[in-house]
């Protein structure tokens, strides 16, 4: 699908824009902690909520909000045609899962570290890697692990197949997610404190190494991606 784009403008008004570069979005107007990232080519909505040198925005593909520095305004371009979500059947998604897995394995081969809020390579957080992997084939997932858990079709651990998502956390909430590879293994981006400070492969077993065992003790369940996310803010 093609979009008609207007020329660059330094101070965009409220409306929909396309990112011309990879951009950082922050979780507060102070812009001290990364919330997420927007890869070049993504669409975002600039709201009327301006505070000093930042503006609140939300990403059109996943409805995720954050704060954007006005210094990044020159990396936005107005879109005259709104973002339109693609639709996929379950069978179409199934055929694309080998490419989703290949994306994560290629990402693991690059020098990387765990980055909270990271969705743009080479550095990702857990759910950012999952979102980027599926987005690489045009399928959009919600941004955070708990949102991805709620979005997928619940399955049992015994039903796991390559390309399914595996969720970890507490009894109250999913705080971590990985992509199942088959034969008990999954790939994920994990942090320094509990994980590998980057992308690695672990096993769903009490017999694995310390990292695998730690996550296995927090295993919540699994989910199957059966559709692409459709924006709710329109």
Residue ranges and their predicted role:
Residues 140-207:
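...with weaker cross-activation on analogous glycine-rich loops/strands in unrelated enzymes
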Residues 112-162:
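Catalytic cysteine-centered active-site loop
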Residues 19-29, 143-150:
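Short, structured beta-strand/loop micro-motifs enriched in basic residues and often containing a Trp
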Residues 51-56:
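Short aromatic-glycine-enriched beta-strand elements
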Residues 27-40:
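SH3/SH3-like (including bacterial SH3b) beta-barrel domains
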Residues 1-14, 32, 45, 58-107, ...:
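Boundary regions of SH3-family modules and the immediately adjacent low-complexity/disordered segments
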Residues 4, 14-27, 181-234:
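Aromatic- and glycine-rich peptidoglycan recognition patches
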